[in-house]
């Protein structure tokens, strides 16, 4: 399995590892959500990074192409039919988005990355912030589910940019930045477990007096707040199962700073 870095998830993986070891069952775990295992990159004072720019600088300084050795093929296993029922696990069936927009599989994910780097990356640095333009890679669902790794994305980006991180194609270097941002926040989650406990990263915000309104929350979730940009974003999520990166930030800020709902 791929390791996860939230406190509960990490503890679950430890317990699972201990149980499998006790039963003499072999297993493998990987840090495949990231290029560097969380906690690997440290400041000169041997403390975890809490600011992105120095983290990115260290990330690039320590980079080795051997990190991207990703061509190992696992032997195909015989399929095991394990019946499952959502009710057994306590899950509820929710609204089904249009999944035809998301062809499954690693080949599809890699195809999307290559098409993006070839056709869209040229304008990515400016188009990425305009949700009316189809200017992003739309690779986030594949990354989130482990269908493609950030290592593979970095490798393809470097190949398309003469193996340069900070020079060359401005759109590609910006896309690499976004992948490093993703890794930075996984390091935050690993290094500062309090954020997994519903506590803010910045202590000064502990004093915020949150409010809660059930009907406002329902309106936000369904895209009926009366604010067009918010409603369009939430309806996109409901319809496509995905939301534009800029809109993710907009609806989150609206939820916390305008509605004053606890994140």
Residue ranges and their predicted role:
Residues 8, 131, 167-168, 243-247, ...:
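Short, surface-exposed helix-loop/turn micro-motifs enriched in polar/charged residues
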Residues 194-226:
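Helix-loop-helix junctions that connect adjacent transmembrane helices in secondary transporters/permeases
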Residues 22-23, 160-165, 240-243, 261-262:
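Secondary-structure transition/capping motifs at alpha-helix termini
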Residues 48, 54-204:
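Glycine/tryptophan-enriched, flexible segments
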Residues 1-67, 235-236:
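Trp/Phe/Arg-rich N-terminal binding region typifying the photolyase-homology
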